[in-house]
Amino acid sequence: MSAPRTLYDKIWDDHVVDQQEDGTCLLYIDRHLVHEVTSPQAFEGLRMAGRPVRHPEKTLAVVDHNVPTSPDRINGIQNEESRIQVEALARNAADFGVEYYSERDKRQGIVHIVGPEQGFTLPGMTIVCGDSHTSTHGAFGALAHGIGTSEVEHVLATQTLIQKKAKNMLVRVDGKLPAGVTAKDIVLAIIGEIGTAGGTGYVIEYAGEAIRSLSMEGRMTICNMSIEGGARAGLIAPDETTFEYIKGRPRAPQGETLEQAINYWKTLHSDEGAHFDKIVTLDAGSLPPIVSWGSSPEDVVSVTGVVPNPDDIADETKRASKWRALDYMGLKPGTKITDIAVDRVFIGSCTNGRIEDLRAAAKVVEGKKVAPTVNAMIVPGSGLVKEQAEAEGLHKIFIEAGFDWREPGCSMCLAMNDDRLKPGERCASTSNRNFEGRQGFKGRTHLVSPAMAAAAAIAGHFVDIRAWK
């Protein structure tokens, strides 16, 4: 009888093509997602070597990072570097026979939202993309992670990847989530607990009642930020919630094939007694709405708390780092989080740009107005999310409240397009990173849930969403 295996063990074992004595493995890759920033050199490498894309039907190209989200983007991309990258992806996809969603295609959007929408992402698969937030797809019980540009070329050419296996880590979130606390708060709390290096060398499996209670969109938010906790990837075992989400998707199995697939997917869970190298447990019932205060995703505190004092940190290097973060953020120890005013609000990204995120934000702002000191924007994660939101009338709620309603794309998550902060501007953001300059030169980012961001837009400062009226 074989030893109990984790979910990660099972997917890994199913995809090993060859293993060397030092543990280095050649893994088969089931799905490859491509965007315009990390792929040009990879395609050029194929072109110079005279190689085709080995499995174009297992590859999907989407433009997302550089595309403008302004309504007039149909007139073309003004930034020359961005335009060159977008044009290169369109040309490369055509030359190599890869399916491509341009900015004019309603299926276009952030690659990690598009994959699941299309049924391209399925349980038990290995999925890669030249983007760190590929971990998002782990919400389906798929082994998904980012790769570098040279690896993008290797996968395009061979449909395989050279890897060494990571260790297993289990994060259990037990109990029921309180009202006002979301998947975003869970994952920020996890990162606050383990730190940004806590998952280094591991693949994290998320489990527990609170995780099981989440929708697929909430689970994608959790797995999306696994990389911010240092992990190679994040996984959630598939269940009926997963199967229902997949049914009817354009590229998902249908009919009898789907039933056969579901029978297999039901085996994708960690066995009783499977070994985890590290286990972390959180109590969902004690979690509050969370706001980041510094320049690292581990710098988090309850919305009812205060900016911490770095002098309380024993480690000298870490203490100096946190003082630097406070200086960059323009904050002082002891400042109440609810006293921090914001200049900008960004609701979107591959972390929180899905329809449920927009519904949560709309519920908060309906019948209210954005504070006169705040510039707020809503960026749907894909054209299909935008279409659904407009069918539900959410765009009218946002526009009437004073939000800017945009076209889909990565937008202000990162300063690679026209949406960015000005120096010194402070933003309540539903994205995943609050590094120095992430949203623009000297911009200050606070990571929050969609409901918290929406409330900050109305109030002009952070508020406890649990007391929102």
Curated annotation (Swiss-Prot):
GO BP term, pick one: L-leucine biosynthetic process
Chain residues that bind [4Fe-4S] cluster: C350, C410, C413
Enzyme class, broadest EC rank: lyase
GO MF annotation terms: 3-isopropylmalate dehydratase activity; 4 iron, 4 sulfur cluster binding; metal ion binding
Record's keyword terms, sorted: 4Fe-4S, Amino-acid biosynthesis, Branched-chain amino acid biosynthesis, Iron, Iron-sulfur, Leucine biosynthesis, Lyase, Metal-binding
Cofactor detail note: Binds 1 [4Fe-4S] cluster per subunit.
Biological pathway: Amino-acid biosynthesis; L-leucine biosynthesis; L-leucine from 3-methyl-2-oxobutanoate: step 2/4
Enzyme Commission number, as recorded: 4.2.1.33
Keyword Cell division part of the UniProt annotation: no
Names of the cofactor(s): [4Fe-4S] cluster
Self-association and partners: Heterodimer of LeuC and LeuD.
Purpose: Catalyzes the isomerization between 2-isopropylmalate and 3-isopropylmalate, via the formation of 2-isopropylmaleate.
UniProt name for this protein: 3-isopropylmalate dehydratase large subunit
Classification lineage: Bacteria, Pseudomonadati, Pseudomonadota, Alphaproteobacteria, Hyphomicrobiales
